[in-house]
């Protein structure tokens, strides 16, 4: 019901060009309203994103990417620079650490190459990622991967989300698929490339340990 209601609100948004969310799903409503206002280029967009990012009870720092991407689209680079100065890369997710590096290097267009609030597929892709992430947090990795594949199909530009499907594979001890997924990151996105290199090394170590244990058992 939650997925259906949210998708219906997006379909209505795309058809009628107005947001008409009935608040009943807590923070999910706030997330949806942030993206829907962003799609409409509403002046409320900033406040919705900042309310999420600054939530004291939960970590919604992921939405920093979309907030700053929208500010770049609106050519408000001063706001982007000032916000980036507050980001601690050592305490941030891979995505937000990568965002800070781009901004510090004045590569602002990186934030708009991968996502646009005016692209309906991009917005729906983020919604499906949200559902995927929820299932992953419940250790329901098969469901998570289904929604993540839908998300990736809708917006293949946002390949950073592949890190979640790789982590799902690892959690299921499917190291070969995890390794193949991580291989899709290259050195043009330095933070993700570093994470890929570190994680693949750990995966190889696990595979070698498993092989040695099998040899010892059957040898």
Describe the function of each predicted region:
Residues 209-219:
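Single conserved hydrophobic/aromatic residue that forms the stacking wall/gate
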């Amino acid at each position: 019901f939650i997925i259906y209601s949210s998708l219906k609100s997006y379909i209505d948004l795309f058809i009628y060009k107005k947001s008409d969310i009935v608040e009943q799903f807590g923070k999910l409503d706030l997330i949806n309203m942030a993206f829907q206002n962003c799609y409409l280029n509403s002046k409320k967009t900033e406040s919705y994103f900042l309310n999420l990012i600054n939530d004291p009870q939960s970590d919604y720092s992921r939405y920093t990417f979309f907030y700053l991407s929208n500010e770049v689209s609106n050519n408000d680079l001063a706001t982007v620079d000032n916000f980036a100065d507050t980001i601690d890369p050592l305490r941030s997710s891979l995505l937000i650490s990568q965002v800070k590096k781009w901004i510090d290097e004045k590569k602002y267009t990186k934030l708009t190459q991968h996502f646009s609030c005016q692209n309906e597929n991009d917005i729906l892709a983020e919604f499906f990622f949200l559902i995927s992430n929820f299932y992953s947090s419940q250790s329901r990795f098969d469901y998570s991967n289904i929604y993540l594949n839908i998300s990736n199909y809708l917006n293949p530009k946002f390949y950073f989300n592949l890190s979640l499907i790789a982590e799902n594979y690892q959690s299921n001890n499917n190291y070969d698929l995890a390794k193949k997924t991580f291989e899709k990151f290259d050195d043009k996105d330095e933070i993700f490339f570093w994470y890929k290199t570190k994680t693949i090394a750990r995966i190889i170590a696990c595979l070698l340990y498993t092989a040695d244990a099998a040899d010892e058992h059957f040898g």
